[in-house]
Amino acid sequence: MGTERAKERAARFAASLVEDGMIVGLGSGSTAELAVRALGERLHDGLRLIGVATSQRTAALARRVGIELRDPDSVDRIDLAIDGADEVEERSLGLLKGRGGALVREKLVARMARRLVIIIDDSKLVAALGARFPLPVEVVPFGWRWCARWLEDLGGRPTLRCRPTGHPFRSDNGNLILDVAFGAIADPAWLDRTIKMLPGVIDHGLFLDMADLVIVGSETGIRLLERSRTVSETSKS
């Protein structure tokens, strides 16, 4: 219950940052979905916005709450993107994302956005990325076992993501996901560049130098971590 309330606090604060007429990137995952619902509530108060969804699941939810959607190729900007994260390294605001399988579209929308706002509960703060979760890597199906071997050569332990049925998980782009356990990543920037150079890799879940604001929800309030490294606190519920 405490974690859900923390997420709700962060999501509602993020939704309050959206101004009338904005084009908003809508992230994927349980925390981002709370922000989508909060934006839907604001529509009843007269807020006008256009959403760009990062997954089919998010798009379906946005439509249900009344948010008008556009394709990323039909907009000339994204004013603000709101998304969650699996891990946030507090000093650099580096992110590890992709457990929901939408990392490629999330990264594209995050890069398009003039401002990227990340919402998490305080359990997602880590001293080093990769300390708690494996790094998702999206690869083309053709030759994926070779991609796994090359990731092993980099010190990772890749596992093909599968559904409960045992069938391989497919991203909305039709690709496979390798969850690669590296442990605490000593040099995220090097790993970022190196994995992207592997043939067959579409992208991975390291989002470095992208977050402008991280909203950290807790049982007592929220904490704001900004790119400038300044930190403020509020007990807004």
UniProtKB/Swiss-Prot annotation:
Catalytic residues, chain numbering? 106 (proton acceptor)
Cross-referenced InterPro entries: NagB/RpiA_transferase-like, Ribose-5P_isomerase, Ribose5P_isomerase_typA_subgr, Ribose5P_isomerase_type_A
Residues holding substrate: 28-31, 83-86, 97-100, 124
Q: Does the keyword Isomerase apply?
A: yes
Catalyzed reactions: aldehydo-D-ribose 5-phosphate = D-ribulose 5-phosphate
Pathway(s) it belongs to: Carbohydrate degradation; pentose phosphate pathway; D-ribose 5-phosphate from D-ribulose 5-phosphate (non-oxidative stage): step 1/1
The kind of enzyme this is, by top-level EC class, is: isomerase
Q: Which SUPFAM superfamilies match?
A: D-ribose-5-phosphate isomerase (RpiA), lid domain, NagB/RpiA/CoA transferase-like
User: Is Isomerase included in the keywords of this UniProt record?
Assistant: yes
Named from the GO MF annotations, one term is: ribose-5-phosphate isomerase activity
Pfam families given for it? Answer: Rib_5-P_isom_A
Keyword set, alphabetical order: Isomerase
Give the EC number(s) under which this enzyme is classified.
5.3.1.6
Q: Which GO terms describe its biological process?
A: pentose-phosphate shunt, non-oxidative branch
Q: Which NCBIfam families does this one have?
A: PRK00702.1, rpiA
* PANTHER family according to UniProt: RIBOSE-5-PHOSPHATE ISOMERASE 3, CHLOROPLASTIC-RELATED (PTHR43748:SF3)
The Swiss-Prot or TrEMBL record describes its family as follows: Belongs to the ribose 5-phosphate isomerase family.
User: What job does the chain carry out?
Assistant: Catalyzes the reversible conversion of ribose-5-phosphate to ribulose 5-phosphate.
Assembly and partners are described as: Homodimer.
Q: What is this protein called?
A: Ribose-5-phosphate isomerase A
Q: Which organism is it from?
A: Thermomicrobium roseum (strain ATCC 27502 / DSM 5159 / P-2)
Taxonomic lineage from the root: Bacteria, Pseudomonadati, Thermomicrobiota, Thermomicrobia, Thermomicrobiales
